[in-house]
Amino acid sequence: MEPRAAILAVLTEEAAPLHWTKIQDLALRRGYLDPFEQPDVRRQVQTTLLALASEGLVEKQAKGVYFLAARADDAED
């Protein structure tokens, strides 16, 4: 699984703000990320979270803490 999909899966399953280290830990423990396939998992998680935040898919709550952004289409349902 790519870091983007792994991060979104963890944040969807947890449905709560998480520190990036917890997101990384859960993704590794659940087998979403393989440190042998993804070199430098830490950097991958951090840069992917920044990219997802700039796209509006995740929001930053505090330093290093992220949560899944509420989508406009989800709010209407």
Predicted regions, residues:
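Phospho-regulated, low-complexity intrinsically disordered regions of nuclear gene-regulatory
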Residues: M1-E13, L28-D77
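Short capping segments at the starts of secondary-structure elements
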Residues: L11-T21
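A short acidic, leucine-rich amphipathic alpha-helix
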Residues: K22-L26
